[in-house]
């Protein structure tokens, strides 16, 4: 479910759905304003911080769009996902600064731990390209919000979709509410009427995979 939300976030920013909804409030026909914003998802580089279960699903759902995936893990000991091709790669945090300048879309699916706090700080946000987008569906501690706001306001990055924040609910006076190129969800990326059914189905699948592996041993 979270993976579907991320796909929707990226498409909505890249294909102008969210920017159009914002600019239509001020302009009668903002076609010209969107001319320099719209980009294809196909052929882009998506960097996923946190290639665990959620990050794996995000990449799997994005791959059919013809993107290249780079996923960050704590170590390189585990095998790559079965949907990886020769253009995809796994890296660790020590290479993050090298990867960020190549990212068209940055997705954060990290747990909330001391190690992930402000992993995207002012310096790392500054490494992103002007057309880059950010999606955060992990935990709000992973992005330093003031430099994110500054980068969005100055249009040093194209836009961001955030489902999580450092303080939740988001305070009424939050500076993030001023950004016209930032779109927010109230920690709702996993909400669905069929969530419990899908959770049980996924658990059963993982249990079956584990049992099959044990039997092979």
Task: Set out the residue ranges of the language-model regions.
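Phosphate-binding beta-alpha-beta segment of Rossmann-like dinucleotide-binding domains, i.e.
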Residues: 1-45
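Hydrophobic "lid"/C-terminal helical patch
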Residues: 6, 10, 103, 152, ...
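Generic structural signal for small/hydrophobic residues in well-ordered secondary structure
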Residues: 6, 41, 46-50, 69, ...
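Glycine-rich adenosine-cofactor-binding loop
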Residues: 39-63
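Residues at the starts of beta-strands that form the adenosine-phosphate
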Residues: 45, 64-68, 181
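Conserved acidic E/D residue at the C-terminus of a beta-strand in Rossmann-like folds
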Residues: 73
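Rossmann-like adenosine-cofactor binding region
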Residues: 76-175
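Adenosine-phosphate binding glycine-rich loop
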Residues: 170-172, 178-201, 206-207, 211
């Amino acid at each position: 479910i979270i993976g579907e939300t991320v796909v929707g976030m990226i498409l909505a920013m890249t294909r102008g759905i969210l920017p159009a909804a914002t600019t239509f409030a001020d302009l009668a026909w903002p076609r010209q304003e969107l001319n320099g914003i719209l980009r294809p998802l196909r052929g882009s580089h998506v960097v996923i911080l946190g290639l665990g279960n959620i990050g794996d699903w995000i990449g799997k759902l994005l791959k059919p769009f013809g993107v290249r995936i780079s996923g960050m893990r704590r170590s390189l000991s585990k095998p790559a996902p079965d949907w990886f091709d020769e253009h995809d790669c796994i890296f660790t945090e020590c290479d993050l600064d090298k990867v960020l300048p190549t990212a068209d879309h940055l997705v954060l699916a990290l747990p909330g731990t001391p190690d992930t706090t402000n992993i995207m700080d002012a310096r790392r946000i500054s490494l992103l390209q002007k057309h880059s987008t950010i999606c955060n569906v992990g935990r709000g501690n992973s992005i330093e919000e003031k430099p994110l706001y500054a980068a969005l306001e100055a249009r040093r990055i194209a836009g961001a979709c955030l489902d999580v924040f450092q303080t939740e609910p988001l305070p009424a006076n939050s500076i993030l509410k001023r950004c016209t190129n930032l779109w927010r969800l109230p920690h709702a990326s996993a909400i669905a009427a069929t969530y419990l059914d899908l959770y049980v189905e996924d658990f059963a699948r993982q249990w079956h995979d584990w049992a099959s592996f044990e039997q092979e041993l």
